[in-house]
Amino acid sequence: MSHTIRDKQKLKARASKIQGQVVALKKMLDEPHECAAVLQQIAAIRGAVNGLMREVIKGHLTEHIVHQSDEVKREDDLEVILKVLDSYIK
Protein backbone atom coordinates (compact mmCIF):
# COMPACT_ATOMS: atom_id res chain seq x y z
CA MET A 1 0.00 0.00 0.00
CA SER A 2 1.29 3.44 -0.91
CA HIS A 3 2.30 5.63 2.00
CA THR A 4 0.10 8.46 0.69
CA ILE A 5 -2.90 6.11 0.80
CA ARG A 6 -1.97 4.74 4.23
CA ASP A 7 -1.52 8.28 5.62
CA LYS A 8 -4.37 9.77 3.59
CA GLN A 9 -6.37 11.14 6.54
CA LYS A 10 -3.35 12.83 8.11
CA LEU A 11 -2.25 14.33 4.78
CA LYS A 12 -5.78 15.48 3.94
CA ALA A 13 -6.02 17.16 7.35
CA ARG A 14 -2.81 19.06 6.62
CA ALA A 15 -4.10 20.03 3.16
CA SER A 16 -7.37 21.25 4.68
CA LYS A 17 -5.43 23.38 7.16
CA ILE A 18 -3.48 24.92 4.26
CA GLN A 19 -6.72 25.54 2.38
CA GLY A 20 -8.19 27.33 5.40
CA GLN A 21 -5.08 29.45 5.78
CA VAL A 22 -5.23 30.46 2.10
CA VAL A 23 -8.90 31.38 2.41
CA ALA A 24 -8.07 33.50 5.46
CA LEU A 25 -5.24 35.20 3.55
CA LYS A 26 -7.57 36.02 0.65
CA LYS A 27 -10.03 37.60 3.10
CA MET A 28 -7.20 39.58 4.67
CA LEU A 29 -6.25 40.94 1.26
CA ASP A 30 -9.84 42.05 0.61
CA GLU A 31 -9.89 44.18 3.77
CA PRO A 32 -7.42 46.59 5.32
CA HIS A 33 -4.91 44.70 7.47
CA GLU A 34 -1.48 45.48 8.80
CA CYS A 35 1.32 44.29 6.54
CA ALA A 36 2.80 42.35 9.45
CA ALA A 37 -0.41 40.33 9.85
CA VAL A 38 -0.47 39.50 6.14
CA LEU A 39 3.20 38.50 6.23
CA GLN A 40 2.57 36.34 9.28
CA GLN A 41 -0.28 34.56 7.50
CA ILE A 42 1.90 33.94 4.44
CA ALA A 43 4.63 32.55 6.71
CA ALA A 44 2.08 30.26 8.37
CA ILE A 45 0.97 28.97 4.97
CA ARG A 46 4.56 28.36 3.96
CA GLY A 47 5.21 26.48 7.20
CA ALA A 48 2.13 24.32 6.67
CA VAL A 49 3.13 23.52 3.07
CA ASN A 50 6.65 22.67 4.24
CA GLY A 51 5.18 20.37 6.89
CA LEU A 52 3.04 18.58 4.32
CA MET A 53 6.02 18.21 2.00
CA ARG A 54 8.15 16.89 4.87
CA GLU A 55 5.58 14.20 5.74
CA VAL A 56 5.22 13.02 2.14
CA ILE A 57 9.00 13.00 1.63
CA LYS A 58 9.53 11.03 4.87
CA GLY A 59 6.99 8.44 3.76
CA HIS A 60 8.49 8.25 0.29
CA LEU A 61 12.05 7.85 1.54
CA THR A 62 11.04 5.19 4.04
CA GLU A 63 8.86 3.16 1.72
CA HIS A 64 10.53 3.61 -1.66
CA ILE A 65 14.19 4.06 -0.75
CA VAL A 66 15.05 2.59 2.66
CA HIS A 67 12.81 -0.49 2.41
CA GLN A 68 13.23 -1.00 -1.35
CA SER A 69 15.09 -4.26 -2.00
CA ASP A 70 15.41 -3.74 -5.78
CA GLU A 71 18.50 -1.55 -6.23
CA VAL A 72 17.49 -0.30 -9.70
CA LYS A 73 14.04 0.68 -8.44
CA ARG A 74 15.61 2.36 -5.39
CA GLU A 75 17.92 4.43 -7.61
CA ASP A 76 15.01 5.40 -9.87
CA ASP A 77 12.91 6.45 -6.87
CA LEU A 78 15.83 8.41 -5.44
CA GLU A 79 16.22 10.27 -8.72
CA VAL A 80 12.52 11.16 -8.70
CA ILE A 81 12.67 12.56 -5.17
CA LEU A 82 15.85 14.52 -5.93
CA LYS A 83 14.18 16.15 -8.95
CA VAL A 84 11.15 17.06 -6.85
CA LEU A 85 13.39 18.55 -4.15
CA ASP A 86 15.31 20.55 -6.76
CA SER A 87 12.09 22.09 -8.08
CA TYR A 88 10.71 22.67 -4.57
CA ILE A 89 13.80 24.40 -3.24
CA LYS A 90 14.19 26.76 -6.22
UniProtKB/Swiss-Prot annotation:
Can you say where in the cell this protein is located?
A: Cytoplasm
The answer to whether keyword Transcription regulation applies is yes
Instruction: Supply one GO BP term.
Output: negative regulation of DNA-templated transcription
Gene3D superfamilies recorded for this chain?
Answer: Metal-sensitive repressor, helix protomer (1.20.58.1000)
Please list the GO terms describing molecular function. DNA binding; metal ion binding
Q: Does the keyword DNA-binding apply?
A: yes
Q: What does this protein do?
A: Repressor of rcnA expression. Acts by binding specifically to the rcnA promoter in the absence of nickel and cobalt. In the presence of one of these metals, it has a weaker affinity for rcnA promoter.
Which NCBIfam families does the UniProt record give? PRK15039.1
Per its record, how is this protein called by name?
A: Transcriptional repressor RcnR
